[in-house]
Amino acid sequence: PFLCLSFLLAIKKDNTTVGVNIGNIAPELKGTTPSGDSISLSNLRGSFVLVDFWASWCRPCRYENRNLIKTVEHFKDYDFPSGKNWVGKTKTKKGFQVFSVSLDRSASSWKKAIKQDKLNWPWHISDLKWWNSDYASIYKITSIPENFLLDPDGRIVAKNLRGKALDNVLEKYRFKANLDKKR
């Protein structure tokens, strides 16, 4: 009996671990948008969120932005599971959100890239510290582009999804939401 209880306590503990591995609760990110507003990653709880690390000077990032825009456009009005312990729930929330974290040094370059690439979502932050970014340190970023897909509870469910791979994972969760609605 003691062994079973210890095992269950260990499972419970792992379910609330904050970290950057799949299954962990994603670390909080707080920052200032290009327009000066304060935002937090936790404000997006209840939605599927892609935390996307990029920079204006990163060619692969800029290329991937085109794919990301298509994904956002495709999934913006779809129902996804929502809420605490979302697996198996029928409650849904519309849309898919992107929380962009830039490793730029120049505010003007960062803002210009957002405009040029048409990254029209409101969730953009940068501490303008390049590779010395506190955000990069928290998420252990060593190269970009890099991203983390979070479920509605803020848990990391996938990492480094690009293009069709991201679309396929989102489609899987959207399909799950629609199945649950029919039950």
Model regions: which residues?
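Short, internal strand/loop/helix patches
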Residues: F99, D104-F148, P152
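Thiol-/selenol-based redox modules, centered on thioredoxin-like
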Residues: S143-I144, L149-R183
